[in-house]
């Protein structure tokens, strides 16, 4: 409750910033590759000057966008308990990752397209990559017991790129991908 904004102007300002960021995420998830200030202004029904009042430049906007996406993605990782079996943890993780990749695939594509055009997008992507790896290892600490080559193989199996290849090129459905991932993880982590 202490963090609640009580000032009406500050609350409206925060709501407007949230609306702008939510709109950008929606545009990316819909497959828009060229998201610019004019498109954001049109979709939010706000003037471009209003957007610039909230975010001084494109980098500031991208930083705020990264924080928003990071919070929702990282907060979504399954909560695990030490007593949970390895198989249960693998299933929870695989289910979360496949569903998250499916929902956000266009956002991942947008990032890949824009990573070479923007230093800030590159920094954001590298930070998210590190956070994903950290959270995966937190859920499956058994990965740390493997040599570096096998760790990389396991992390690759759990990556968006692997999911995309299975989904797009191999035309697998999420259920099939989850089964393939579980089979591969069990093989690498030696479970039955």
Identify the role of each PLM range.
Residues 151-174, 187-192:
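Amphipathic C-terminal alpha-helical segment
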Residues 66, 78-79, 98-123, 164:
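Amphipathic alpha-helical segments used for helix-helix packing
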Residues 26-29, 33-35, 63-92:
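Amphipathic alpha-helical linker/stalk segments
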């Amino acid at each position: 409750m202490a963090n609640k904004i009580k000032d009406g102007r500050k609350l409206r300002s925060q709501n407007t910033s949230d609306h702008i960021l939510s709109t950008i995420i929606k545009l990316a998830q819909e497959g828009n590759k060229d998201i610019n200030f004019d498109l954001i202004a049109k979709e939010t029904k706000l003037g471009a000057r209003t957007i610039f009042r909230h975010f001084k430049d494109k980098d500031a906007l991208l930083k705020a966008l990264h924080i928003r996406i990071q919070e929702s993605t990282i907060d979504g990782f399954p909560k695990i308990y030490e007593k949970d079996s390895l198989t249960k943890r693998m299933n929870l993780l695989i289910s979360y990752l496949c569903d998250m990749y499916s929902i956000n695939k266009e956002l991942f594509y947008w990032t890949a397209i824009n990573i070479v055009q923007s230093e800030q997008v590159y920094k954001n992507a590298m930070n998210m990559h590190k956070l994903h790896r950290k959270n995966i290892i937190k859920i499956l600490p058994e990965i740390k017991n493997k040599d570096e080559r096998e760790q990389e193989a396991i992390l690759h199996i759990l990556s968006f790129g692997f999911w995309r290849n299975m989904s797009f090129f191999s035309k697998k459905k999420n259920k099939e991908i989850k089964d393939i991932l579980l089979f591969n993880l069990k093989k690498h982590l030696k479970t039955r």
